[in-house]
């Protein structure tokens, strides 16, 4: 019997730092059916916390070294970084040169897992490959309309677009009047077994309880400044607790300064990025997500899998994940609403017990096999058109 030819798929990523998009890509590389697909990952920069998690059986194309492989001499490293930036700019202007030097095979499908890779994939000199894009962003909170329109127009050029939540696609039509007939909504895979396993790696002992944990990049729209003010207000009203935030980012110094000004250095813990955040989440009593915008955050499902009662702002695709009052609590995106929900968790044990019981259905809610099948069908069908 003649062996069926595998579909050759190239995933492009800028780098592989800790974050939602790289984690999704790594999961697909591990779990899409190898009997159907020949998978390759192409990194512009071989750097990031997740480098060690790249599957060994996956072909890897590296365009440029990461900082970790560079000289430890600051002067030499500075020169290396400048040269790297120049080479990357040349490759951006002349993608044919990049492919001639680095990409030795022709691929059937080239994938942009997020908007950062849109132009990389669309400018591929391989005109025969089908281009598939992913979009995970809630555009309603982006005030830079020209940037949003650029992304919207780039998405029209893909042979197929995958949106990470129904809301992510719908909001583009509602605000900008643009629809995507060649698209589908596929939720990101949430690896409940993985987060559960990693949660047992070590013990975490918080000094002040109960603890609200939270996890995300320290970006202004993630709402941590507001969360800190809510935390202070709860303490001032006699509700003892602490907050543990796992994540690094551009707002770290501002948050440290605010923490000092509010006098909550002992109770508002900034734990920075952690390669394994799950023991910190497991050791907490509740989880809070104060974001102004999200798409379909993996963290919500993973935390639910650890049976932690969740408070989240009612934004993006989160209402597609949390059933309000059943397996979590959804609140408006403002400090008063977050305050009232956190106060309720601290004072209403029956509510917390009910939400905790609701989280026990997480496995049924987030069925990963169904998602791998949906992606497989997209890749197979896009080649037929």
Feature map (PLM): residue ranges:
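Conserved acidic donor-binding segment of nucleotide-sugar-dependent glycosyltransferases
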Residues: 324-325, 329-335, 344-350
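A short, histidine- and acid-enriched strand-loop-helix "catalytic/donor-clamping" loop
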Residues: 116-119, 129-146, 160
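N-terminal strand-loop element at the rim of the active site
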Residues: 11-18, 31, 35-86, 175, ...
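A short, well-ordered alpha-helix in the C-terminal region of glycosyltransferases
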Residues: 337, 344, 351-365, 373-377
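Aromatic "clamp/platform" in nucleotide-sugar-dependent glycosyltransferases that forms part
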Residues: 273, 292
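Short hydrophobic beta-strand element within catalytic cores of glycosyltransferases
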Residues: 309-312, 322
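A conserved mid-protein helix/loop that constitutes part of the nucleotide-sugar donor-binding site
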Residues: 19-27, 210-233, 239, 250-257, ...
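Acidic anion/phosphate-binding donor-loop and adjacent secondary structure
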Residues: 143-145, 170-174, 181-209
């Amino acid at each position: 019997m003649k062996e069926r030819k595998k579909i050759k798929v190239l995933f492009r990523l800028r780098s592989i730092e800790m974050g939602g998009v790289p984690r999704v890509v790594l999961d697909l590389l591990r779990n899409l059916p190898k009997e159907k697909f020949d998978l390759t990952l192409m990194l512009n920069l071989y750097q990031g916390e997740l480098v060690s998690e790249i599957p060994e059986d996956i072909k890897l194309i590296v365009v440029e070294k990461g900082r970790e492989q560079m000289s430890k001499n600051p002067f030499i490293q500075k020169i290396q970084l400048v040269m790297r930036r120049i080479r990357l700019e040349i490759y951006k202007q002349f993608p044919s040169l990049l492919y001639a030097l680095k990409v030795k095979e022709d691929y059937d499908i080239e994938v942009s897992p997020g908007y950062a890779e849109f132009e990389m994939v669309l400018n591929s000199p391989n005109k025969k490959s089908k281009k598939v894009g992913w979009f995970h962003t809630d555009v309603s909170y982006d005030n830079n309309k020209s940037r949003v329109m650029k992304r919207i127009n780039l998405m029209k050029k893909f042979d197929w677009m995958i949106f990470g939540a129904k809301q992510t696609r719908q909001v583009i039509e509602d605000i900008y009047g643009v629809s995507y007939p060649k698209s589908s909504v596929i939720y990101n895979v949430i690896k409940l077994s993985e987060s559960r396993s990693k949660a047992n790696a070590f013990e975490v002992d918080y000094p002040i309880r109960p603890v609200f944990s939270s996890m995300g990049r320290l970006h202004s729209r993630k709402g941590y400044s507001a969360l800190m003010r809510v935390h202070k207000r709860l303490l001032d009203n006699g509700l003892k607790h602490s907050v543990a935030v796992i994540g690094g980012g551009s707002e770290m110094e501002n948050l440290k300064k605010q923490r000092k000004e509010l006098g909550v250095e002992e109770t508002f813990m900034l734990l920075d990025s952690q390669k394994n955040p799950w023991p910190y989440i497991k050791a907490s009593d509740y989880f809070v997500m104060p974001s102004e915008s999200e798409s379909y955050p993996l963290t919500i499902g993973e935390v639910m899998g650890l049976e932690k009662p969740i408070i989240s702002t009612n934004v993006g695709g989160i209402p597609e994940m949390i059933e309000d009052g059943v397996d979590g609590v959804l609140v408006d995106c403002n400090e008063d609403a977050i305050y009232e929900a956190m106060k309720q968790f601290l004072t209403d044990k029956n509510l917390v017990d009910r939400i905790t019981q609701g989280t026990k259905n997480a496995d049924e809610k987030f069925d990963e096999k169904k998602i791998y099948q949906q992606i497989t069908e997209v890749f197979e069908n896009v080649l037929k058109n």
